[in-house]
């Protein structure tokens, strides 16, 4: 049986991991085993933080809307309740942008 040399495949796999770890400090960018662990951890935190970003932005939008609505003399929960009751279908992101970019049109919503 002929001999199968796998050097190219293994080297490509290792170099792919090491390429992802450029810019890391110490052995995390040069040694394969530590680089592999660091890559796994980095990819898992990137995955979780992509989901966490959605939560943090929603909280930011709610805080902006709440601050703007309280200047008009009502609370956030009452404002959202009246929006739903009047069937105004604007999401929190759009409302937050209205607060920042177009305050007069937002004040018409609070009336």
UniProtKB/Swiss-Prot annotation:
Tagged with keyword Chloroplast: yes
Localization per record: Plastid, Chloroplast
Function in brief: Binds directly to 23S ribosomal RNA and is necessary for the in vitro assembly process of the 50S ribosomal subunit. It is not involved in the protein synthesizing functions of that subunit.
Main location: plastid
A GO biological process held by the record: ribosomal large subunit assembly
InterPro entries membership: Ribosomal_bL20, Ribosomal_protein_bL20_C
Family assignment from sequence similarity: Belongs to the bacterial ribosomal protein bL20 family.
Record key words, sorted: Chloroplast, Plastid, Ribonucleoprotein, Ribosomal protein, RNA-binding, rRNA-binding
Naturally occurring in which organism (per UniProt): Ostreococcus tauri
Protein known as: Large ribosomal subunit protein bL20c
Top-rank taxon: Eukaryota
Residue spans crossing the bilayer: none
Coiled coil segments of this chain: none
GO cellular component terms given for this protein: chloroplast; ribonucleoprotein complex; ribosome
Keyword check for Chloroplast: yes
One function term, GO molecular function aspect: rRNA binding
